[in-house]
């Protein structure tokens, strides 16, 4: 049923006669004040619009160097994956954060990354990249003076954990390309497209309940290992511009490097970068029946160029230990259900490390977990690696530097209760990797 329109009659309403008001005029002073008020309101409005539209924030990058006299140089400072370099870098980066976050304004200081620690007669020299966000109308030189003033004031107060030589401090504005090149010299750093660091079955065949990757460059070390004519077989992890880390069982059926290709990017089709494989190295003591020593290396015929979307992960020091319930991430193109199809888009899942004592319980894996294996997932199941994820990375975020701690190896089905994923423990094979690659 439709509602009919309501009919109005002019005669239904009495006619109202309004008394005409006598015409009035404002005096000149009141008129002038009113005009000034309107102009002020318009001016404020234009200012606000200009602030948000014209003065968009822009990234500014600087390369700083200074001498620290309270630190004696150690040989391992020259090895970026060493515990000594990592710990000292974090100390310096925390110091820079305290200096600039308090004085640069909310959100102005973004991040710092130590690039190099080198020897000096008086201690050590530090080379570090500093990143800030300021209005685009600001100039790099003006911001540079602001940074220098803030740094010198902090040195005068003498409340820093390190003794820094004031005359040694130098600061140079750099462009985004130079900044990327410097950061690309470090491993395990993720960058967004706007050049801001991003603040997280036992066969070849194995992320259930994960999600699709949010953006290119979120997991830039992830690779797809593909058998020519058969497509995606396994995941792999970029650890240098020519070497990838993967699982030995991925090559069980075919060890001929000429039959394999490697692609990078968040999709298998189309790939972002494609490379041929020149060499395959399988651990000499790999045992397929027990899954022990399930680790292999693949060398590319042509090196890859590091960028925001293709980057190497850090190899951990052999002494790195992760306690149970440490948050880690597994990524891959594997199926999302047991025996399901490979996914074209890269997926990720957050899982937790599980102690070997728990994993070796009779109701879990009943003693099958060896020192070279690492369990991760949840005892209640639901989130896990699966078919097609094998060989891919399990990574750990240590203060925005990412380390590969596991390689997807085996498990009983996918995401079952009391059957977490089992990974090759990378720290156990750190010396083996170094002996084969020099890394």
UniProtKB/Swiss-Prot annotation:
Q: Which domain of life is it from?
A: Eukaryota
An example GO CC term for this entry is: extracellular region
| Residue ranges of every copy of the SEA domain listed in the record | 58-176
Disulfide bridge map: 234-250, 359-375, 386-414
EC number per UniProt: 3.4.21.-
Q: What InterPro entries has UniProt attached to this entry? A: Pept_S1A_HAT/DESC1, Peptidase_S1_PA, Peptidase_S1_PA_chymotrypsin, Peptidase_S1A, SEA_dom, SEA_dom_sf, Trypsin_dom, TRYPSIN_HIS
GO MF annotation: an example: serine-type endopeptidase activity
Q: Which residues lie on this side of the membrane: Extracellular?
A: 55-439
Q: Where is the Peptidase S1 domain?
A: 207-438
> What protein family is recorded?
Belongs to the peptidase S1 family.
Q: What does this protein do?
A: Probable serine protease.
**Annotated protein name in UniProt:** Transmembrane protease serine 11F
- The species this protein was found in: Mus musculus
């Amino acid at each position: 049923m439709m509602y009919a329109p309501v009919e109005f009659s002019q005669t239904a309403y009495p006619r109202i006669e309004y008394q005409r008001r006598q015409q009035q005029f404002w005096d000149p002073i009141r008129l002038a004040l009113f005009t000034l008020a309107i102009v002020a309101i318009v001016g404020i409005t234009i200012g606000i619009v200009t602030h948000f539209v014209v003065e968009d924030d822009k990234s500014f990058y600087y390369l700083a160097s200074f001498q620290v006299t309270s630190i004696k140089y150690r040989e391992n400072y020259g090895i970026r994956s060493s515990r000594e370099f990592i710990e000292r870098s974090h100390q310096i980066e925390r110091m820079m954060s305290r200096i600039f976050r308090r004085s640069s304004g909310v959100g102005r200081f973004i991040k710092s990354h130590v690039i190099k620690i080198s020897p000096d007669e008086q201690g050590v020299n530090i080379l570090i990249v500093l990143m800030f966000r300021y209005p685009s109308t600001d100039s790099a030189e003006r911001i540079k003076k602001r940074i220098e003033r803030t740094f010198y004031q902090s040195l005068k107060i003498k409340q820093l954990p390190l003794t820094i030589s004031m005359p040694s401090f130098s600061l140079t504005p750099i462009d985004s390309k130079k900044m990327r090149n410097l950061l690309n010299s470090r491993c395990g750093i993720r960058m967004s497209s706007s050049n801001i660091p991003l603040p997280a079955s036992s066969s070849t065949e194995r992320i259930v309940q994960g999600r699709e990757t949010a953006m290119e460059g979120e997991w830039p070390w992830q690779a797809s290992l593909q058998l020519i004519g058969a497509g995606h077989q396994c995941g792999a992890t970029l650890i240098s511009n020519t070497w990838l880390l993967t699982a030995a069982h991925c090559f069980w059926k075919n060890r001929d490097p000429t039959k394999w290709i490697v692609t990078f990017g968040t999709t298998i089709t189309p790939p972002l970068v494609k490379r041929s494989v020149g060499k395959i190295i399988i651990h000499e003591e790999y045992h397929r029946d027990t899954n022990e020593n399930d680790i292999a290396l693949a060398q590319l015929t042509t090196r890859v160029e590091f960028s925001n979307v293709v980057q190497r992960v850090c190899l951990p020091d052999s002494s790195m230990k992760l306690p149970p319930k440490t948050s880690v991430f597994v990524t891959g193109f594997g199926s999302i259900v047991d025996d399901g199809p490979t996914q074209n888009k890269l997926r990720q899942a957050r899982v937790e490390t599980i102690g070997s004592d728990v994993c070796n319980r009779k109701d879990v894996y009943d003693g099958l977990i060896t020192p070279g294996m690492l369990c991760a997932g949840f005892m209640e199941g639901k989130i896990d690696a699966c078919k097609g994820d094998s060989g891919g990375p399990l990574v750990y975020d240590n203060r925005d530097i990412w380390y590969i701690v596991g390689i997807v190896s085996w498990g009983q089905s996918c995401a079952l209760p009391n059957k977490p994923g089992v990974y090759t423990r990378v720290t156990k094979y750190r010396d083996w990797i170094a002996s084969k690659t020099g890394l």
